[in-house]
């Protein structure tokens, strides 16, 4: 059985945040505190330890007491670049990933993804959300993966491909559908930030 001590949490804070005017999203105030603090609070009970993937504000992120790792690829290459360095530093059998700007992520994210992982002996399990209209949307940056996937990911990245769903298709992967799409809401615009603060007040 996969337990908390088997999982390292990786918070992805390495993006450009172009739609937010280039502001470092993890440090944007949310209810008066940097967004990343909500991500840390949600992940901490679900994992053994946390690692933060960031490409700027390194000193600030380091004040939270966790290791801060930078992408090894240039020009803000996306979540797979963060996955890659996360796997490289992971010392537990599993890595759980989440972006820094989704403050409402499920308290049982690790538990449900781990149960599916064990059910089908998968290499990676990602979250999906059921929207109000009944459609199911993949939420691939919320995923639990085996920490021995670094070679697979490196080979994929060496082909010049950065599409997260295409890498998933090369693996034994599955998904868990969450009924509340709000738990994966993230911040891409000031309007979305305001809306998230309202629904989580």
Predicted regions and their residues:
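Hydrophobic helical membrane-anchoring modules
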Residues: 199-201
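Nucleotide and nucleotide-moiety/phosphate-recognizing core
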Residues: 2-161, 166-185, 190-192
């Amino acid at each position: 059985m996969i337990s908390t001590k088997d999982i390292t949490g990786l918070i992805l804070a390495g993006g450009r945040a172009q739609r937010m005017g280039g502001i470092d999203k993890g440090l944007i105030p949310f209810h008066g505190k940097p967004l990343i603090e909500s991500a840390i609070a949600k992940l901490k009970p679900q994992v053994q330890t946390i690692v933060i993937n960031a490409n700027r504000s390194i000193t600030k992120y380091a004040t939270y007491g966790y290791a801060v790792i930078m992408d090894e690829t240039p020009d803000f290459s996306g979540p797979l670049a963060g996955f890659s360095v996360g796997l490289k530093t992971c010392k537990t059998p599993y890595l759980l990933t989440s972006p820094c700007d989704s403050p409402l992520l499920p308290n049982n994210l690790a538990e449900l993804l781990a149960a599916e992982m064990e059910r089908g002996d998968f290499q990676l399990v990602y979250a999906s959300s059921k929207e109000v209209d009944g459609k199911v949307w993949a939420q691939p940056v919320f995923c639990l993966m085996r920490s021995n996937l670094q070679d697979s990911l490196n080979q994929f990245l060496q082909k010049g491909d950065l599409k997260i769903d295409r890498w998933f298709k090369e693996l034994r992967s599955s998904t868990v559908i969450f009924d509340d799409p709000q738990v994966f809401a993230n911040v891409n615009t000031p309007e979305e930030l305001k809306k998230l603060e309202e629904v989580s007040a």
